[in-house]
């Protein structure tokens, strides 16, 4: 409704009246209702007697007594006594008779009232300008609302507006907030404020001002963040208006506004201007209901408001926004709510205002008006229907005005749209046009927050659109669109996206399902956030004896497990389409089967509702982790409705309505989900467009508010009944439903298949008009009258005509007219002109679907008007829900249909049709047409310009003598006076204080030598290692302080110091008494010499002081060399100290075992050498002063005799393989030798035998050039016996012929553990042509250096004749070498050891191995095969293209050329000493062990991590993983052998060739090299650490187990690794398989022994580690040395016996809170199960244990 053009005049008048009413200066009853009883008005608002000062009202209190209390309320002024007709329901008490001359008195008093108003305005404005600060309003702009339940409070202006509030709607069951004090009598003193002003919201206010929103309609959503916008209403009493007992004790309380979460409110106030400062009054609903707030929106009404604001102050400007209905001081009464209206009492309304917004002035009129709403209120067709009803008939109020505003016209239209099918004639009992519009201002409408409130949630919303991939969509011939759920279906969502945090108290669940199996299954479930129990759900049991149960799962808050609230047993319906519905209302639950009530059972539940956590889950066809049973079958419909009533139209398929193709708000039903019908959901909350003028009778097939048409459904000889009509008081209409056709037996008659949609039929004839309605309805509109567009009462609701008497009692509602008979279907013809749109008619009974009609003929009609905006559709969030627990979450990983934000506002609708001009209005307050008296005096004008200065006035009389003045300030200093006479000599003064000591004098001449000084502190020890063996005079510093030795003889006197600079002369000091002997001071640094001073007197010599303690400072001057002191040996590892006292060096103790070097060949025992001659004494060393300067030569002590030889140390670990050197120069060619005879093969069955001494070298053959090296898998073999040479391979392809090189003589076997013969054979080029046999040549000259320089022999010569077959050797581990290109295929060998591998291609011919010596050694060996005949010698080939290794000096150089390196080649960067391997599309770094110093005798070995080699044989499909022997030296010297004893290794299968030099690589799948490989036949369990430390928050034991599994797989470990942790459900001891606990050793990643068995670890001694034990991570890092683990502690959560400690495992390893603790052990203490509770925020080592030894998987 557009504002009236002439409303400004009355607005100005009301503005003045409002200000006066604010100051209690004026009674405005005459303005609003000229027929009001003045006796009531006199007690309500006292009239002023002249201008009265405005008094603050904060000190006036109103004692409000609970309604059931016995104490009468002590009512303050402004709180009238309620009339008797409302105190007792059902008894009509006659109202006070009005005096017949009341109108005349009213007219006569207008002039006096106006004069009083004018005077009051002047006083009030002046007082307001002087007392109200501008910033007081700004502080009152922020709204703080109480949630979830709180009273509706109005904050009125007082001396402290922020501290004042009057409770309007008291809440029930809320604890008293601070500041609310209850007396012994049960009353609560509360301040009585004045009515609220514009800027003061109707709730307690705190904080700074909020900038106003820019839209015309505002809500709290713009201010209060993104909390879920939900307002939940309690269902009204099922009996409607039946009398109810008084509400329980209620107290008016001040709301607690602290620590609350504000809500977005669904009901807001309309606003006119562009700038609206939102404010709200909140409703505290009883019980556990959520809050529904009505938000008042103030606005800027135009320039005149700002003008008044500038004139009278901000408070008055704010008051101007509420003009229109003048909510602050209307004439009326605030009365207690009668018990006959429990529907409003449930909303928290305890008092209401009369007259209401329908101008009812008595309780009887209110009850009569409420009868027309009785049936509609029971339908719950709109979520805010009860609010609309109560705001209209019983507007809530406090003890003082104003009442709550009326609902807006748009609110009314939204109700009419949602409830049209439940209305008789499609109309509400009130005309929406009679209510103010949103643009008019002071009214309540539905805000944006209500658009997300869903009264019904359907299947497609719960599944998402599109549904998850595991849920398939089908088109069933019986029901249409349906969804198939299999065993893998997953459809979890967050419940709070569809339901409020406080779930519906009463509700219904509707299903249309067809089970596919006889097993149990959950149809629907809402779980807690942990998915531990089902809060609400429906479950089908398994079929037993032809029956199955349907259970309602309803778990009360605080319960520990899922509770079955009710269970119904019915015949099994597997494979049958069945309608099921559960209705939960109050204390009962009812089951409906195929639309008939099957059984009703009591439901025991508390008054508390279901609180849904933020992470609560919502599932369809399952219950997530709370229940493993999943429903398997087809679901066509699933609805969760807030309405507990289950009607046939909800239960049955709406087959006749093709436009209703969806179930729920967003649809999941049988038609197009995009078309939504809102007739049942009540969710079409957006206001519709203004409807055209109604016709007399609605058509039979009308249009929905969101659909263009409904299909025609006509059944012959059937009367169309009103859908959902209820029997209203005083009417005879019968409640009927038109759901489906029923047979005489009462069963539902199933219809046939759906046909196609027919064309709309011809509208039937209009029905007969009904009898006239209530006389209270407004008449036709009149001409615009001077009325404000702001207010809800008075002319804004209904135009008040001229003088008329008070309205009589309302008549009874007329019975609705009968619906017209349905017309016969007309023949299809050309469509006629479009007629006026009629009201939607009631749907007829469901009839059979007709055939689709022919399309109409004719031109296309004009487009219809734009429809209202549709309901919000589901939005889809593409991010997946993340849940903490890794043990399995029922939430789906698919796109989830989560409700999205509100869309943009739609385009403005078309302008309405202008109304007819009304009759000229009359002045509404006089009884005649004569003009009224003069108006009020105007507001004071602006300040005029200053006048001319006046003439000076006459002098005034002399004033009285003033009070004495204050004492003056001190004057300034005067000038200096004349000098005085000389005084007499004074008495001698007292002795002065003793002066400070003078500066130190200059050093005197050198005195005689003094006695020897006291012994100094012990000097530092000597280091464990000496650079020169003869000793040095310089200082030595040890790594640890030695023990104090015996006192040595006194040292020589020190050198003479330099003379100092002369110091200033000082006064002679008095000789002091001898002081107490002090401790020797620390030597200080030499200071700057002062000037020479006078010589002081020599003091007496003090006594010798005690020896001082060790000081901290610069070292003193060293003394002269003394006799030889003790030589101290300090261990570099553990800091232990060994010393040998005595002047001369005696033979020392046995030294610590040195690091293990590589095991060499067995040499002959050498004789003990004699000690070398003693060297000459060196030059004396220098002596240094504290500042670093050299003072003089020092003397060197004599060297002691060499000590005895210590015992032999333990065997060291084998050394690392050396780097591959470059090929040496080819030797001089020799003569080809004669072919030797074939040797006899060795007998492999004899076991391992000793090999004989090597024979003389054979004649050299023609050497070939070295080719590309290949990988040698047996570089470090563990066996002590060499094997015979392998089988010769097939002849390789010929290579390019090279120049003939010189042949060098073969050198003796070297000491370096490398197979040079094999390497050379692998580096050969392609075989050349066969040469002629030559004579034996002379011995060639020695070669000029081998691979590693001239100190080593050159490479072996060409292969000689094969020798006799030796005994087979033990296969050694894989060694570090160069991975070459695959050679040509060799012949298939016999099966190897272990599981059969796949057959590989034949290898290249292998040369015989170099001679070896008997006994243990580290020479490379091969698994021998029977010797074959040697191939014919070829001509020398050219030099190979490459050795398979590329060297670069820097990493930058490597990055520039690495793309040129073939895949599989090794790359060495000299600058960083790093090794890389070229892989597909990049390169990978090879992890190396720590550097090992070269042992004596070798100078070319370097540590290298042995990369894995996977050998594939044609007959073995499983890869064989070789076991690298440990090659690192021990990290500390101890008595542990570097090579721990290994378990016995079985010998290989007889005759199995070991393809040690051939590697089959898979070029298509380059993988990262595993850090470990292990033999199949060795039973061990590995204990390995994760690659990075973890805090106590590991996402549970399953999260840690998963990381162990994942990282073990990444390095090629196929066993099952579990975290070395105790948890809530497992002890650490029980992780390893029972069969492997007693005898299987525990080793690290390098197979170094850690514990002899799993049980030995839990012997109660906290798992002591052996000295030198190492623990590696999966990527090969030593956790005790690597900086990745700064804290060397291990999580375990166990006691020493491996049992879990429930108080110390970081809350099942799920938290990293500093306050939580977990049991850990420090590895620095040498124990794996040490008992130390540490904070869970620390990042410690997490170990993984292989829980069983599985040979086949390793």
UniProtKB/Swiss-Prot annotation:
Residues 57-73, 157-169, 717-738 have a biased composition (Polar residues). Residues 1502-1571 are annotated as: Non-collagenous domain 1 hinge region. Residues 1045-1127 are annotated as: Triple-helical region 4 (COL4). Residues 762-789, 862-874, 904-914, 946-961, 1005-1021, 1117-1126, 1254-1268, 1282-1296, 1353-1365, 1401-1414, 1424-1436, 1541-1551 have a biased composition (Pro residues). Its main location: secreted. Residues 1197-1269 are annotated as: Triple-helical region 6 (COL6). Residues 752-785 are annotated as: Triple-helical region 1 (COL1). Residues 1412-1424 are annotated as: Nonhelical region 10 (NC10). Residues 1347-1353 are annotated as: Nonhelical region 9 (NC9). Residues 1443-1754 are annotated as: Nonhelical region 11 (NC11). InterPro entries: C-type_lectin-like/link_sf (IPR016186), Collagen (IPR008160), Collagen_superfamily (IPR050149), Collagen_XVIII_Fz (IPR035523), Collagenase_NC10/endostatin (IPR010515), ConA-like_dom_sf (IPR013320), CTDL_fold (IPR016187), DUF959_COL18_N (IPR010363). Residues 42-104, 152-256, 645-1443, 1511-1556 are annotated as: Disordered. Residues 1184-1196 are annotated as: Nonhelical region 6 (NC6). PROSITE patterns: FZ. Residues 672-681, 815-831, 1095-1109, 1321-1341, 1519-1535 have a biased composition (Basic and acidic residues). It is found in: Secreted, Extracellular space, Extracellular matrix; Secreted, Extracellular space, Extracellular matrix, Basement membrane. Residues 900-1021 are annotated as: Triple-helical region 3 (COL3). Glycans are attached at residues 68, 129, 164, 889, 926, 1567. Residues 1354-1411 are annotated as: Triple-helical region 9 (COL9). This is Collagen alpha-1(XVIII) chain. It comes from Homo sapiens (Human).
């Amino acid at each position: 409704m557009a504002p009236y053009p002439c409303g400004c005049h009355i607005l100005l008048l009301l503005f003045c009246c409002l200000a006066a009413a604010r100051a209690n200066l004026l009674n405005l009853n005459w303005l609003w209702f000229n027929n009001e009883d003045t006796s009531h008005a006199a007690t309500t608002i006292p009239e002023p007697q002249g201008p009265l000062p405005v008094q603050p009202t904060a000190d006036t209190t109103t004692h409000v007594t609970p309604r059931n209390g016995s104490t009468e309320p002590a009512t303050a002024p402004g709180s009238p006594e309620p009339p008797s007709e409302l105190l007792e329901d059902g008894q009509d008490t006659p109202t006070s008779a009005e005096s017949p001359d009341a109108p005349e008195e009213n007219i006569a008093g207008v002039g006096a009232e106006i004069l009083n108003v004018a005077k009051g305005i002047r006083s009030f404005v002046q007082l307001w300008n002087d007392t109200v600060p501008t910033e007081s309003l700004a502080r009152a702009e922020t709204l703080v609302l109480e949630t979830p339940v709180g009273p509706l409070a109005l904050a009125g202006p007082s001396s402290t507006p922020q501290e004042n509030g009057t409770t309007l709607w008291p809440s029930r069951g809320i604890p008293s907030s601070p500041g609310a004090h209850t007396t012994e009598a049960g009353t609560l003193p509360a301040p009585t404020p004045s009515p609220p002003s514009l800027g003061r919201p109707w709730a307690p206010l705190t904080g700074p001002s909020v900038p106003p929103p820019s839209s015309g309609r505002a809500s709290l959503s713009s201010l209060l963040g993104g909390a879920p916008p939900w307002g939940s209403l309690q269902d009204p009493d099922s009996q409607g208006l039946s009398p109810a007992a008084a509400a329980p004790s209620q107290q008016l309380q001040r709301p607690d506004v602290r620590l609350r979460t504000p809500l977005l409110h669904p009901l807001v106030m309309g606003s006119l201007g562009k700038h609206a400062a939102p404010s709200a009054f909140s409703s505290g609903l009883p019980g556990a209901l959520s809050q529904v707030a009505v938000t008042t929106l103030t606005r800027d009404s135009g320039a005149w408001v700002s003008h008044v604001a500038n004139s009278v102050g901000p408070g008055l400007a704010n008051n101007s926004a509420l003009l229109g209905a003048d909510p602050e001081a209307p004439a009326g009464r605030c009365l207690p709510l009668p018990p006959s209206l429990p529907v409003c009492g449930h909303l928290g309304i305890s008092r209401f205002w009369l007259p209401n917004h329908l101008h009812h002035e008595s309780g009887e009129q209110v009850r009569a008006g409420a009868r027309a709403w009785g049936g509609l209120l029971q339908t719950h067709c709109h979520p805010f229907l009860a609010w609309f009803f109560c705001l209209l008939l019983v507007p809530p109020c406090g003890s003082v005005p104003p009442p709550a505003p009326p609902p807006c016209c748009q609110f009314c239209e939204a109700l009419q749209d949602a409830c049209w099918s439940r209305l008789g004639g499609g109309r509400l009992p009130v005309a929406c046009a009679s209510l103010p519009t949103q643009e008019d201002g002071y009214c309540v409408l539905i805000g944006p927050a209500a658009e997300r409130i869903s009264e019904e949630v359907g299947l497609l919303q719960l599944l998402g659109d599109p549904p998850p991939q595991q849920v398939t969509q089908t088109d069933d011939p019986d029901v249409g669109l349906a969804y198939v759920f299999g065993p893998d279906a997953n459809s979890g969502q967050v419940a709070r996206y569809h339901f409020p945090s406080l779930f519906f108290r009463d509700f219904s669940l509707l299903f249309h399902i067809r089970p596919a199996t006889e097993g149990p299954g959950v149809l629907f479930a809402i779980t807690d956030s942990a998915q531990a129990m089902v809060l609400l759900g429906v479950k089908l049991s398994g079929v037993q004896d032809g029956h199955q149960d349907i259970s309602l799962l309803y778990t009360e808050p605080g319960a520990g497990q899922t509770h079955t609230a009710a269970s119904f047993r019915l015949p099994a319906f597997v494979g049958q389409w069945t309608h099921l519905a559960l209705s939960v209302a109050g204390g009962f639950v009812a089951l409906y089967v195929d639309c008939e009530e099957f059984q009703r059972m009591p439901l025991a539940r508390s008054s508390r509702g279901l609180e849904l956590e933020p992470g609560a889950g919502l599932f369809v066809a399952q219950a997530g982790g709370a229940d493993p049973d999943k429903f398997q079958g087809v679901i066509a419909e699933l609805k969760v409705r807030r309405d507990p009533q289950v009607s046939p139209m909800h239960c049955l398929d709406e087959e006749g309505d093709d436009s209703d193709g969806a179930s729920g708000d967003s649809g999941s039903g049988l038609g197009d989900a995009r078309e939504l019908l809102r007739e049942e959901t009540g969710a079409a909350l957006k206001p519709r467009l203004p409807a055209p003028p109604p016709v007399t009778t609605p058509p039979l097939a009308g249009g929905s508010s969101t659909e263009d048409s409904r299909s025609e459904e006509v059944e012959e000889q059937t009367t169309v009944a009103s859908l959902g009509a209820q029997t209203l008081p005083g009417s005879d209409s019968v409640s009927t439903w038109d759901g489906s056709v029923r047979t005489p037996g009462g069963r539902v008659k199933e219809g046939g298949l759906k046909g196609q949609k027919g064309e709309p039929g011809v509208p039937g004839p209009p029905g007969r008009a009904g009898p006239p309605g209530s006389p209270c309805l407004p008449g036709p509109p009149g001409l615009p009258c001077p009325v404000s567009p702001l207010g809800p009462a008075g002319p804004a609701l209904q135009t008040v005509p001229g003088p008329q008497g008070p309205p009589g009692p309302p008549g009874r509602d007329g019975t609705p007219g009968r619906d017209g008979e349905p017309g016969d279907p007309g023949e299809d013809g050309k469509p006629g002109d479009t007629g006026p749109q009629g009201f939607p008619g009631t749907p007829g009974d469901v009839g059979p679907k007709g055939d689709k009609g022919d399309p109409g003929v004719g031109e296309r009609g004009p487009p219809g008007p734009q429809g209202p905006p549709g309901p919000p559709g589901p939005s889809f969030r593409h991010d997946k829900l993340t849940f903490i627990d890794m043990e399995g979450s029922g939430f789906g990983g698919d796109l989830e249909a989560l409700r999205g934000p509100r869309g943009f506002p739609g385009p403005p609708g078309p302008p309405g049709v202008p109304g007819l001009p009304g009759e000229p209005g009359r002045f509404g307050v006089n009884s005649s047409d004569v003009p009224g008296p003069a108006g009020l005096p105007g507001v004071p004008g602006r300040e005029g310009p200053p006048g001319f200065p006046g003439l000076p006035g006459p002098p005034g009389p002399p004033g009285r003598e003033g009070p004495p003045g204050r004492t003056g300030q001190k004057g300034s200093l005067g000038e200096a006076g004349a000098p005085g006479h000389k005084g007499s000599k004074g008495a001698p003064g007292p002795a002065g204080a003793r002066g400070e000591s003078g500066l130190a004098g200059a050093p005197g001449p050198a005195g005689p030598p003094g006695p020897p000084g006291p012994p100094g502190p012990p000097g530092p020890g000597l280091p464990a290692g000496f650079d020169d063996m003869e000793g040095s005079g310089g200082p030595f510093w040890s790594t640890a302080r030695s023990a104090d030795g015996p006192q040595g003889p006194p040292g020589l006197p020190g050198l003479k110091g330099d003379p100092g600079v002369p110091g200033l002369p000082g006064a002679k000091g008095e000789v002091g008494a001898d002081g107490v002997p002090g401790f020797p001071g620390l030597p200080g640094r030499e200071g700057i010499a002062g000037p020479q001073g006078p010589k002081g007197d020599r003091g007496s010599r003090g006594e010798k002081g005690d020896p001082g303690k060790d000081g901290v400072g610069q070292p003193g001057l060293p003394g002269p060399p003394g006799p030889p002191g003790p030589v101290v040996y300090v261990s570099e590892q553990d800091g232990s100290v060994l010393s040998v006292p005595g002047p001369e060096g005696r033979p020392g103790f046995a030294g610590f075992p040195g690091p293990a070097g590589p095991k060499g060949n067995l040499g002959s025992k050498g004789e003990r050498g004699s000690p070398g001659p003693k060297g000459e004494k060196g030059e004396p060393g220098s002596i240094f002063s504290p500042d670093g300067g050299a003072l003089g030569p020092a003397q060197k002590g004599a060297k002691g005799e060499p000590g005895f030889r210590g015992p032999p140390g333990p065997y060291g670990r084998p050394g690392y393989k050396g780097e591959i050197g470059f090929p040496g120069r080819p030797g001089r060619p020799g003569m080809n030798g004669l072919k030797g005879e074939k040797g006899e093969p060795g007998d492999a069955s004899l076991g391992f035998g000793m090999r004989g001494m090597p024979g003389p070298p054979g004649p050299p053959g023609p050497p070939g050039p070295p080719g590309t090296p290949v990988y040698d898998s047996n570089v470090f073999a563990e066996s002590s016996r060499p094997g015979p040479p392998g089988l010769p391979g097939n002849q390789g392809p010929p290579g390019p012929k090279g120049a003939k090189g010189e042949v060098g003589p073969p050198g003796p076997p070297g000491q370096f553990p490398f197979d040079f013969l094999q390497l050379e054979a692998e580096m050969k080029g392609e075989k050349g042509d066969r040469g002629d046999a030559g004579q034996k040549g002379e011995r060639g000259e020695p070669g000029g250096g081998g691979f590693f320089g001239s100190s080593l022999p050159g490479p072996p010569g060409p292969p000689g004749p094969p020798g006799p077959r030796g005994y087979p050797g033990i296969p050694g581990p894989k060694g570090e070498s160069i991975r070459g290109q695959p050679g040509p295929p060799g012949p298939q060998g016999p099966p190897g050891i272990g599981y059969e591998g796949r057959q590989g291609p034949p290898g290249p011919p292998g040369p015989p191995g170099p001679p070896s010596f008997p006994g243990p050694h580290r020479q490379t060996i091969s698994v021998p095969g029977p010797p074959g005949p040697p191939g014919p010698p070829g001509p020398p080939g050219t030099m190979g293209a490459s050795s398979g290794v590329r060297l670069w000096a820097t990493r930058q150089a490597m990055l520039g050329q690495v793309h040129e390196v073939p895949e599989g080649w090794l790359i060495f960067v000299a600058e960083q000493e790093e090794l890389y391997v070229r892989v597909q599309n990049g390169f990978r770094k090879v992890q190396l062990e720590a550097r090992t110093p070269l042992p004596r005798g070798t100078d070319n070995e370097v540590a290298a991590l042995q990369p894995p080699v996977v050998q594939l044989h044609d007959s073995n499909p499983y890869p064989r993983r070789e076991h690298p022997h440990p090659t690192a030296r021990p990290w500390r010297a101890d008595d542990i052998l570097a090579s721990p004893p290994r378990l016995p290794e079985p010998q290989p299968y007889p005759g199995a060739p070991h393809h040690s030099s051939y590697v089959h690589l898979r070029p298509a799948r380059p993988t990262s090299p595993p850090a470990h490989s292990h033999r199949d036949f060795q039973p061990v369990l590995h204990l390995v650490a994760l690659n990075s430390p973890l805090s106590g928050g590991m996402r549970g034991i399953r999260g840690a187990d998963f990381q162990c599994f994942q990282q073990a797989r990444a390095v090629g470990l196929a066993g099952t690794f579990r975290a070395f942790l105790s948890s809530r459900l497992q002890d650490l001891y029980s992780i390893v398989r029972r069969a492997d606990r007693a005898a299987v050793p525990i080793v690290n990643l390098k197979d170094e022994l850690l514990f002899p068995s799993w049980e030995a670890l839990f012997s109660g001694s906290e798992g002591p580690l052996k000295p030198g034990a190492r623990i590696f991570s999966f990527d090969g890092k030593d956790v005790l040395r690597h900086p990745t683990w700064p804290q060397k502690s291990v999580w375990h959560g166990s006691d020493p016996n491996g049992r879990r400690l429930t108080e110390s495992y970081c809350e099942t390893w799920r938290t990293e809170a500093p306050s939580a603790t977990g049991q850990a052990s420090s590895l620095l203490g040498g124990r794996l199960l040490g008992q130390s509770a540490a904070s869970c925020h620390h990042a410690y080592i997490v170990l993984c244990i292989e829980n069983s030894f599985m040979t086949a998987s390793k």
